[in-house]
């Protein structure tokens, strides 16, 4: 574990493909254990919002990086929920608007922005007990994390989860289309040049296809608690 004063910090990395349940599980475990949950996707959304609010083109890498360098992105736990702050302002809702959602992929693909976010993610992980989820946390962002989990699940089960999630939000999309989208996303994530989706050699693989959220939370929590005792 990383040492902070007389205390030791725990780093938990959860990686895996889209809709494998990473964020849902990570949020619950972070809340239960009092860890900071670092939503790496929200960080790229924050960068996109910074560009938007400053009327900068989403492909202008240098301008966006200059703005991000002058900004602060923070996560705070408030009333059991994680809030995202940019320059002291709560932007938790602002980063989820259609405008930001439609353009975050372009911003997150910028090499210097990814490098900057990885730097910030490591900085955050050096100050708190953290649980972080993404595609390359255990391999790139936190290669020395005490606990590394790689969640997998069948395309069919992941598509069904996303389908139900969409239904709850009033979004209607054909299940077969969702399955296709996930297959395409899997290919892109595992073949991209910068930080591709890859299981770390020392990660514990957990198939969530036939597991409930509570069962996944229990299994990962047990792994973390065993590591804390060592």
UniProtKB/Swiss-Prot annotation:
EC number: 2.7.4.25
One GO process term, biological-process aspect: nucleobase-containing small molecule interconversion
Top-level division of the source organism's lineage: Bacteria
Subcellular location per the Swiss-Prot or TrEMBL entry: Cytoplasm
Any one GO MF annotation of this record: dCMP kinase activity
Broadest EC class assigned to this enzyme: transferase
One Pfam family hit: Cytidylate_kin
InterPro entries (alphabetical): Cytidylate_kin (IPR003136), Cytidylate_kinase_dom (IPR011994), P-loop_NTPase (IPR027417)
Binding, ATP: 16-24
Family assignment from sequence similarity: Belongs to the cytidylate kinase family. Type 1 subfamily.
GO cellular component, one term: cytosol
Catalytic activity of the protein: CMP + ATP = CDP + ADP; dCMP + ATP = dCDP + ADP
Keywords tagged on the record: ATP-binding, Cytoplasm, Kinase, Nucleotide-binding, Transferase
Name the UniProt record assigns to this protein: Cytidylate kinase
Main location: cytoplasm
Keyword Iron-sulfur annotated: no
